């Protein structure tokens, strides 16, 4: 069974088509209109061994906020839909990823209880033209729409690009672990009998 989902979202600010495959090959086809986000999603996809296709048109003449946020919404919805009833999944994932001088950690719980925590500080407000605060917006909307508990810790680093890159790689690896099917798990991984 292929775990996948397709999401379409059209507002006055953005028009997004997104396809997501959990059990993929690390292949990304991305046209986000936000070059730095495209780069980060490519890393996320490769290191999570997902397949991700995104076509997005947004009001980037204003800034990248709406497009970045709405892609986070769509990816979260796609992850939730692709997981289905979550039977047999590991549920939890944890990954440390270094990128040169930077070290990031991402912990996820596919619990159906949305929560987002972020610890760490980026030294720069921008990477190129990309507003660094949008990393938080993207991750929060992803967690909210996927209905997952997401904790992100940037332990240290000096280069903001490296730090964010480590976060997105760790996110891919943590979600890869959490979405894996564990043959020992019978039903849903919760003593409640549901997630």
From Swiss-Prot:
Transmembrane segments: none
A UniProt-annotated Pfam family: IGPD
UniProt record, GO biological process: L-histidine biosynthetic process
GO molecular function: imidazoleglycerol-phosphate dehydratase activity
EC number(s) reported in the record: 4.2.1.19
Reactions listed under catalytic activity: D-erythro-1-(imidazol-4-yl)glycerol 3-phosphate = 3-(imidazol-4-yl)-2-oxopropyl phosphate + H2O
Localization in the cell: Cytoplasm
Cellular component per GO, a single term: cytoplasm
Top-tier EC class: lyase
Entry keyword set: Amino-acid biosynthesis, Cytoplasm, Histidine biosynthesis, Lyase
Primary site of residence: cytoplasm
Pathway annotation: Amino-acid biosynthesis; L-histidine biosynthesis; L-histidine from 5-phospho-alpha-D-ribose 1-diphosphate: step 6/9
Family: Belongs to the imidazoleglycerol-phosphate dehydratase family.
Name of protein: Imidazoleglycerol-phosphate dehydratase
Annotated source species: Geobacillus sp. (strain WCH70)
Lineage: Bacteria, Bacillati, Bacillota, Bacilli, Bacillales
